[in-house]
Regions:
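Glycine-rich phosphate-binding loops of nucleotide-dependent enzymes
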Residues: 1-207
Length: 207
């Protein structure tokens, strides 16, 4: 949809970050009323405003990636194992080919593409089954976008369910199995790939 169609608000609502006035959201048998419910249900969310809503810029890479992995990195009781955290973080750095001198460097020092990899890393490390990606390629140069698309495709092949929110029709047409168009907060069109995606038709339902 267009930028004010309600798609960004919908993404937040699916993750429990936006109050729902009517209806409900369920994932893996759990009712999502808050972000903590979503995380427990295996739902991850990347915001279009990643610097402000998905990352702690003045914290190191390791703190960002391990922020969703408390249970996996516990030593005993409430205590965290620093060794487990470092291994947990390094696994994502290697898997996502994140370019950084050290996992202890601040996220603010990274390029846009590598910042987005940190966001992906924290949800993949948490083994999220459903990923809500709101404009994941925004602010990323063309060369890095192709790498991002491959990462998203690999997530899909690994069995993740992807909710891809975007204002860019070419990437939606190229990546989606099914497209929902939002206009004025309502679904104006739902169409599957097998029915044929036409950019002209999609635009018609957007404006």
């Amino acid at each position: 949809g267009l930028s004010h169609s309600g798609m960004h608000t919908l993404g937040k609502a699916l993750f429990g970050a936006e109050e729902i006035l009517s209806g409900s959201v369920h994932a893996n048998g759990k009712n999502i009323k808050h972000t903590k419910d979503a995380i427990k249900a295996g739902v991850g969310y990347t915001s279009k405003d990643r610097d402000y809503e998905s990352l702690c810029l003045q914290s190191p890479i390791i703190d960002n990636i391990t922020s969703t992995g408390y249970e996996k990195n516990r030593a005993f009781g409430p205590f965290i194992s620093r060794k487990k955290e470092a291994e947990y973080c390094q696994e994502q750095i290697d898997k996502l080919q994140l370019k950084c001198a050290s996992m202890y460097h601040l996220v603010s020092t990274l390029s846009g593409g590598n910042k987005q990899k940190v966001v992906f890393g924290k949800w993949l490390a948490a083994d999220s089954k459903i990923l809500i990606l709101d404009c994941p390629t925004r602010g990323i140069d063309v060369g890095v976008k192709a790498n991002m698309y491959k990462m998203i495709y690999d997530m899909k092949k690994a069995g993740k369910a992807i909710v891809f929110i975007s204002e860019e029709l070419p990437e939606l047409v190229g990546m989606s199995d099914r497209i929902l168009i939002l206009k004025d907060g309502k679904v104006s069109l739902e169409i599957a790939r097998k029915e044929g995606f036409s950019e002209h038709k999609l635009i018609e339902y957007m404006i």
